[in-house]
Amino acid sequence: MERRRRPTLEMVAALAGVGRGTVSRVINGSDQVSPATREAVKRAIKELGYVPNRAARTLVTRRTDTVALVVSENNQKLFAEPFYAGIVLGVGVALSERGFQFVLATGRSGIEHERLGGYLAGQHVDGVLLLSLHRDDPLPQMLDEAGVPYVYGGRPLGVPEEQVSYVDIDNIGGGRQATQRLIETGHRRIATIAGPQDMVAGVERLQGYREALLAAGMEYDETLVSYGDFTYDSGVAAMRELLDRAPDVDAVFAASDLMGLAALRVLRASGRRVPEDVAVVGYDDSTVAEHAEPPMTSVNQPTELMGREMARLLVDRITGETTEPVRLVLETHLMVRESG
């Protein structure tokens, strides 16, 4: 049987009745082609089953049409925390709509950062989405030195806002909403399991908790504050610490659903009923909260939208549609369930 010849650019041009250069312009997304011609070329591509040569296209456009989503955590944390799933989904959808693909990379140690920096600066990608950064992360400086555009997922700590593009969640507002809910339901010994203080989400959710207490005329008491890193295990340790220091606690705001789930289980193991003895509010509004026992009240943050907006800002930067830094902050809302 004769093997079918692989379709070429010239074959597409002949079928569409246009020149080779016109086909290239359509493939590369140029706006210098009439709508009718563009449709004719697309029909020819579909009919022939033509697949553009990405390597050749890269030589012409000087782009790979690929971006990296870099999560500055280890793999275990990436796949354990529900927050990241929504981000990845939103990024993937938005990039696909613009004809881009992405690679997912993680790294937290110095060696991992060095390896990542070398890869990202090596013209393998057109830009980078940075997620879950800590205060000491070297990746932004590496990208600046290499001239690689990037967008932060979350407002960066210690960086002048006017110099960078980012998409963030209103973490202060979310922390405030959670704490106000506990105040409004009559609780007075309200503790919090805060997130890491080298990350903006951890800092700002704690700030929202504090602001809500002070606005209600209540004291901010350090003995009612313990810290975790958003993981389940850290939530277990933090809740036990709170009960040791303040056994009369009657409510807990946990800065992630996993830490909230940990609080629920530690409270149950200690003989306390939720919400009758101690109310609990989490943060993420993930399936973890929905399927907890009892179902957990939680702050909803639009992670899929966050991923979409991060991708949109980066592609706009890559294609030259925007050159100035853009900053977006997305709103949160409280999903009330049985735990508090």
UniProtKB/Swiss-Prot annotation:
Compartments where located: Cytoplasm
Induction, per UniProt: Constitutively expressed.
Pfam families reported for this sequence: LacI (PF00356), Peripla_BP_3 (PF13377)
GO molecular function, one term: transcription cis-regulatory region binding
GO cellular component: cytoplasm
UniProt entry tagged with the keyword Lyase: no
Alphabetical list of SUPFAM superfamilies matching this protein: lambda repressor-like DNA-binding domains, Periplasmic binding protein-like I
DNA-binding region(s), residue ranges: 9-28
Control of this protein's activity: Activity is controlled by cytoplasmic cellobiose levels. Binding of CelR to the celE promoter is inhibited specifically by low concentrations of cellobiose, the major end product of cellulases. Activity may also be regulated through post-translational modification.
TM regions (residue ranges): none
Family annotation (InterPro entries): HTH_LacI (IPR000843), LacI/GalR-like_sensor (IPR046335), Lambda_DNA-bd_dom_sf (IPR010982), Peripla_BP_I (IPR028082)
Keyword line: Cytoplasm, DNA-binding, Repressor, Transcription, Transcription regulation
Outcome, altering residue 55 to T: Decreases binding to DNA and forms a less stable complex with the celE promoter in the presence of cellobiose
SMART domains: HTH_LACI
Major location (coarse): cytoplasm
Domain HTH lacI-type as annotated: residue spans: 1-61
Function: Transcriptional regulator that regulates the expression of all six cellulases, encoded by the cel genes (designated celA through celF). Acts as a repressor. Specifically binds to a 14-bp inverted repeat site, which is present in the upstream region of the cellulase genes.
Name of the featured protein: HTH-type transcriptional regulator CelR
